[in-house]
Amino acid sequence: MKTKKKKKIVFVCTGNTCRSPMAEIVFRRLVEEMGLTTLKICSAGLQVAPKSKINEKSAQTLIDKGFDVVRFKPKQIDEKLLVESLAIVCMTDVQRDLLMEMRWQAMKAAGEEEIENNVYSFSELAGYEILDPYGKGIDCYHYVFELIAGGMSAIIEKLLPVGVREKYIPKKRTSSPTKKTTKKKENQEA
């Protein structure tokens, strides 16, 4: 089977309700600002509950940061996404390891001639994992948003073709104003 040109980047977390929706929505805006209309950005989860919705705190965080979440609906990762994606970015190394095996099986089943690694963890691309804020306060969701947004320039640099990425690589990563607050809280608790 001949390999189709892949134009989809997928962000993956556990339930597609907290982290990966934030990554999808932030990265989509960057791609639109770059004028890359043929590149499709989406997200999916490893274990998506039926009729699930974006987490209220994730939605509120995105709204607080100026993003629209009205049309977002969580979806389960499937063989089609595994086979048709240019890149799959998982929030953790454990998720990456699981998806690499799933993708390899899906590619073999689809009769793909070449099976290149296109499954990455956020830490491979940006230097740190994105841990799950589920069950924590809104400040934690804002912190996770800052981590995700801060890693986007590294993801652009490592995933997009050379001629494309030079058109738009943010001059500096978004800093997290909550990092100092978090360190202060940790020091106070110690």
PLM feature spans:
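Phosphate-binding/catalytic loops
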Residues: 87, 94-175, 179, 183-190
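Hydrophobic beta-strand core positions in alpha/beta domains
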Residues: 11, 89-90
